[in-house]
Amino acid sequence: MRDSFLKSSPVSQVTSSSSIPLDEAVIQRLIDLAEDAGRAILSFYEQDAEVREKSDASPLTAADLASHHEIMQGLKALMPSVPVLSEESAPINAVERLAWSTFWLVDPLDGTKEFLQRNGEFTVNIALIDHHMPSLGIVHVPAQKRTYVGRVGDGAFLLGPDRRKTSIRISEEAQDPLRVLGSRSHPTPDLDAYLLDQGAFVMEAVGSSLKFCRVAEGSADLYPRFGPTSEWDTAAGQAVLEAAGVTSLTFRAVRFGTISIPVC
């Protein structure tokens, strides 16, 4: 995905809504589920983790799997008829998956490298995809006890450690110098070349989907991403961004569940 998430003025054309009933009680249950998964992750946080390498060379730990099982069980109990695609799911036949009109898209532990480094910048991502677009996104940051929630067309909010609910919105104007976020684990030469054309900027390295949320809450201006990334890495963050009013000269809202391999 080669999209730059730069906030400027609120976007008006994003009106996606879910065909699944999402009242406040359902959204609260989803928040609780993300936070339960976060607690499962934190139960491993201070331990020396055994790390396995997946086929794509990314790391896998017991914390990834504990969060995965927590979320899978919770979503199946909440909405048994809605399929779930998780990063840690067993492979699902592409023909079957591409026929889904509505499904959950989950990254049970985004930022496993950040988890292993114990820097607190890892997240739990839960998104509802409806007709290829995210209509709801929940990004929970377990180590910070912060949960970002975005319902496209209905706004975004943050639940902080004090459980206070605060509406979030992108800043109306980019700052000078531009506040830019980059990946802590995946720096690229393309990013360096891109930033040469952006004028004055201050770069901050941040892990996981927390970067999306930083732009959504207005504490950063730009998150450029170059190279491939998986759909479960971006779906929940995209929903939070859109709900918070993101727009950009280069922002392209990614459509999900349209290709046989979930990479965008």
What is the predicted function of each stretch?
Residues R2-L109, A193-L196:
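N-terminal subdomain of lithium-sensitive/metallo-dependent phosphomonoesterases centered on the IMPase/IPPase/PAP
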Residues W100-Q144:
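Glycine-rich active-site/cofactor-binding loop and its immediate structural neighborhood
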Residues I41, D64, L75, T112, ...:
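Residue-level signal for inorganic ion chemistry
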Residues I126-C213, L222:
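Acidic beta-strand-loop-alpha-helix segment within the catalytic core
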Residues S86-E88, G207, R252:
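Short loop/edge segments at beta-strand edges and connector loops
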Residues M1-D32, A193-D197, F212-C264:
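Oxyanion/phosphate-interacting regions
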